[in-house]
Amino acid sequence: MGIFNWVKQLFATKATTRSQATDLQALFGGEVTASLTLPHYQAYPLVTPTTETELSAYQLHCLLNDQDKQRLDTLLCQAGFEHVGSDMPFNGVLHHTSLQTTVFLQQYADFAGFCVLLITNDINLLQQLITFKAAPPAPWESFPDVDPDTLGSLQGNLEFWCDAFWRPYWLSLGETERLQYPTNWFEFSEFH
C-alpha cells in the first residue's frame, strides 16, 4: 500500500473518527492506568503516552519486519491477549483473557513490512514492549527502486516512511549499529 492508498484509508477512517475516538475513550478513558516510568533511552519501537491526553494508556507506532512482527504477535499471546493473524490487516480491540486490560491494534502491510499502532493500558505488556527491540525492513527493502544518493527533500511515501518509522528507528541506534548500514543509506539517514 502506497501513500495514496494510506491517505485514502486514512480519510475513510476519518469518517468514523468521532465514533473511534468515542470507542477509545470508552476503552481507555475510565480507570487511571498505573503510572509507567518510561526510560530515558528506549530501543525501537518507542512506547509513548497516547497523543490523546484524556486517554489513560500508552502507545506504540512502528513499522516491523516480518520476523519482528511474528515476535510481537507471540508477545501479545503470551501476555494473555487474543491471537490475530500476523499477516492480515486488523483494526480492532484485543481483550485480555483474565484481566480487565485491553489492546487497540491497527496493523496493515506496507513498506515491505507491517505498520502497527498499538494502544494499551496493560502495564505488564507495556513493560515488555519497552524492552522489545525490533527493526523495520531495511530502506532498500521498503524502497527497492530508490537511490538515496539522488534524494533531496522528501515527499509522499518516502517522507511519511522517514518521519513516522525510519527516523525514530535510526535515532534509537548507537553509532556502531548505524555504521553497519551501506554508506549511501547511512548518509541519507544522517541527513534526513
Name the predicted role of every residue range.
Residues 2-192:
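Polar/charged low-complexity regulatory segments
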